[in-house]
Design a protein with these regions (language model features):
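Flexible, glycine/charged-enriched surface loops at secondary-structure junctions
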Residues: 114-120, 155-157, 224-242, 273-274, ...
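Long, basic N-terminal domains or extensions that often function
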Residues: 2-243
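Extended amphipathic alpha-helical scaffolds
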Residues: 2-56, 241-377, 562-576, 584, ...
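Glycine-rich, flexible beta-strand/loop modules in the N-terminal catalytic cores of phosphate-handling
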Residues: 24, 36-121, 126-128, 133, ...
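Single-stranded RNA-binding regions, centering on S1/OB-family and related RNA-binding modules
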Residues: 560-562, 566, 571-716
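Mobile "lid/hinge" segments at catalytic clefts and subdomain interfaces of large enzymes
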Residues: 151-267, 457-555
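Flexible glycine-/small-residue-rich
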Residues: 44, 53-55, 72-74, 124-128, ...
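Short, hydrophobic beta-strand segments
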Residues: 124, 196-201, 242-246, 257-266, ...
Length: 716
């Protein structure tokens, strides 16, 4: 019996294309991942990202949050590479992949219904990379399109663009060459009406340019939103009905009516612990009063607490009143200290209200640079910033867990804020690691880590170009569109507010921005105001607290830090310094006690716990690569005598010959009449022949030395 074969027909296949900043963006639907709730193959230039979205049929029980999972998955075959791991396959997500996942999650999460409890998974798999076309942009557009046309309720779509600044011009979706020279790297996500996400790193960019870039990106994003709406109009599915999270409105109304005065008194304090103690006591009163009437009230208490606190905080903030009594533009009490830990290379303790961060700086040789196995053409990572948020910082009684995405994200934000002010490798040939330990958290720990890390870097003697300060801006909006911004948000304002707009920078300009929202987006007016008030706050923090603590980087690194010395040799001499099988460089390391790292361009970095070892290693390398120069004087040792002349050692292993005719102005019958083995004499290089043989003159050297002495010049 013959085999029956039927050819698969993709009858539902559809494709849409638009121009995105001069390059084609294509979204294909109906050909891949057919069993997912929604899927698409997104092609931007030659960058290809497969996006699949799935939703569970039923809500997850026992949770009070929306269970959204976003995964940005890098495949190294996308750039024609085999993973460097032992198993030669992709393992846990790289840091850039984790940050890309957060980048997609943050603008989309607020646009899902607040009480939606069905699991939603968005998986973006990078399958091909064109470095001129960002995979993150393609992934976010694809995720937005898939969720929008799926049955999942979503208040989108959103679009996404990257913004650069090259040669004084704002550039949208810069290509690879433009990114290398761009002074800012900004990712903007937005709906047709409002901006929903900003993530930025910049080289001290003025606020006005940053704002102009965001506005320009939003105008272009509106075209993407219209493009996705066209797709939804053609293939969009009916939105699913879902079980709304249960809430007892009747119980809540009674609590508000009976306990408003007590609740306001509980909230009105700058001490987080006092507030929580008061609130817990009030919840006990709720039990006493309502448990008999509402025996199932425990399941609603958390939501009642959230709504009640938000009601009070929102009303107060709209009136210009804050829970701790501050004005809208008032920063909590600050303290800064350096040199906190005695034997580390640098440390800084920064305290803002009940938020406290200890940052510690460690210096090492460039061999300690981090190597990343990612889809990006990134060189070794010289500066590493790690952020730790232990449970005790918020008073939780549990064991610490492994690093989570939030910690990765906050560390990356601080890193992005500080990289623009770091010295070049030539100026400061060290690998630098800063660890920010959150000791106490009541809001804005990421910005505290930026301030504390600036202090630690300066304490460590890192010659940063300018100190960096970070501050956050909050937002509350009324139903009529009126709004109130406020500076330096604390925990309760972050929890119940609608925005956490983090800005870091120097007095010259912005170095980093991260904007997180809990609403449907920001108008341009709000963004402009947030940039203005955070600028004033940065200046105040620098002038009044950080610079009085330490006005400039220390002139020397810590005595406990490795000493570094950099030198440059002819690249052709590298093999001589390394030696066969590394024998020469191993000998240098063993005899000097210093470590030696050699780059392909001939740059050599020497490191040791003490300067003497560095100098010894440098002297040995200088000897190995020594090349005599014609016309120069050298002081050497006579090591061999032949009938026709004497051989003089200019450096270990480097000899030259003084012909008998070059020993004196008169005729010399015997070499030993002028010099003997072991004599230290001055010689002048007269010639280096095509075979590399060095010819010397003793008599010319004597004449030149006499002339210099007569002229009062020293001979070295």
């Amino acid at each position: 019996m013959s085999t029956i074969i039927k050819h698969k027909q993709f009858n539902n296949f559809k494709s849409w294309t638009m121009d995105l900043c001069g390059r084609p963006l294509t979204i294909e639907v109906g050909k891949v991942a057919e069993l997912a709730s929604a899927s698409a193959m997104v092609k931007y230039g030659d960058t290809t990202v497969m996006v699949a979205v799935t939703v569970s049929p039923r809500p997850r029980d026992g949770i009070d949050f929306f269970p959204l999972s976003v995964e940005f998955e890098e495949k190294l075959y996308a750039v024609g590479r085999i993973p460097g791991s032992f198993m030669r396959r992709e393992g846990r997500p790289s840091l850039p992949a984790v940050l890309a996942s957060r980048l997609i999650d943050r603008p989309m999460r607020p646009l899902f219904p607040y009480d939606f409890r069905n699991d939603v998974c968005i998986q973006c798999t990078v399958m091909s990379v064109d470095y001129d076309c960002s995979p993150e942009v393609a992934a976010m557009i694809g995720a937005s399109a898939c969720v929008s046309y799926s049955e999942i309720p979503f208040a989108g779509p959103i679009g996404c663009l990257e913004v650069g600044y090259c040669d004084g011009e704002i550039v949208l979706n810069p290509n690879q060459e433009q990114r290398k020279t761009s002074r800012m790297d900004v990712t903007v996500a937005a709906t047709a009406e409002k901006v929903v996400m900003i993530e930025a790193g910049a080289d001290e960019i003025p606020d006005e340019i940053m704002y102009a870039g965001i506005v320009k990106a939003h105008e272009e994003i509106k075209k993407q939103v219209a493009f996705i709406n066209q797709i939804v109009a053609e293939i969009g599915k009916p939105k699913m009905e879902y079980d709304h999270a249960q809430f007892n409105q009747e119980l809540f109304d009674k609590i508000v009516a009976d306990f408003m005065d007590e609740a306001k008194a509980a909230m009105d304090t700058d001490d987080k612990n006092v507030r929580e103690t008061r609130w817990n006591a009030m919840i006990d009163h709720w039990h006493e009063k309502y448990l008999e009437e509402y025996p199932d009230m425990d399941q609603y208490l958390e939501e009642c607490t959230y709504k009640f606190q938000k009601k009070i905080v929102k009303a107060w903030l709209l009136e210009g009143h804050r829970v701790d009594g501050r004005a809208k533009n008032e920063i909590r009490p600050l303290a800064a200290e350096v040199g906190v830990l005695p034997r580390v290379h640098g440390s800084g303790l920064f305290t803002r209200g009940q938020t406290q961060v200890l940052s510690v700086c460690t210096l090492n040789t460039l061999a300690a640079c981090q190597k990343l196995d990612t889809i990006w053409e990134e060189e070794e990572k010289r500066y590493m910033h790690h952020y730790n948020f232990p449970p005790y910082s918020v008073g939780e009684a549990r064991a610490p867990r492994s690093t989570n995405r939030r910690e990765y994200g906050h560390g990356a934000l601080a890193e992005r804020a500080l990289v623009p002010v770091l010295p070049s490798v030539d100026e400061f040939p060290y690998a630098i690691r800063v660890v920010s330990e959150v000791l106490s958290s009541n809001g804005s720990t990421s910005q505290g880590s930026i301030c504390g890390s600036t202090l630690a870097l300066m304490d460590a003697g890192v010659p940063i170009k300018a100190p960096v300060a970070g501050i956050s801006c909050g937002l509350i909006q009324d139903d009529d569109g009126s709004f109130q911004t406020f500076i330096d948000i604390q925990g309760v304002e972050d929890f119940h507010g609608e925005m956490d707009f983090k800005v870091a920078g120097t007095k010259a300009g912005i170095t980093a921005i991260q904007m997180d929202l809990k609403n449907d987006g920001l108008t341009h007016e709000i963004i402009k105001e947030a940039l203005e008030i955070t600028k004033d706050a940065r200046y105040a923090i620098l002038d009044e607290v950080m610079l009085p603590c330490i006005s400039a980087p220390r002139t020397e690194v810590s005595k406990y830090a490795p000493k570094m010395l950099t030198m440059k040799i002819d690249p052709d001499k590298i093999r001589e310094v390394i030696g066969k099988g590394g024998s020469v460089i191993q000998k240098i390391t063993a005899e000097s006690g210093a470590t030696v790292d050699i780059e392909d361009d001939g740059t050599i970095h020497i490191a040791s716990p003490n300067a003497e070892a560095c100098d010894a290693a440098k002297k040995m390398i200088d000897t190995i690569v020594f090349v005599p120069q014609v016309g120069e004087l050298y002081y050497g040792k006579v090591v061999r005598i032949l009938q026709f002349g004497a051989f003089v050692e200019l450096a270990p292993g480097k000899d030259g010959m003084v012909h008998i005719s070059k020993l004196a102005d008169h005729r010399v019958e015997k070499v030993e009449d002028v010099v003997n083995i072991g004599d230290m004499i001055w010689v002048k290089v007269t010639e280096i022949d095509d075979k590399g043989r060095v010819n010397l003159s003793y008599k010319d050297a004597v004449k030149e030395i006499k002339a210099k002495k007569a002229a009062g010049e020293s001979v070295k």
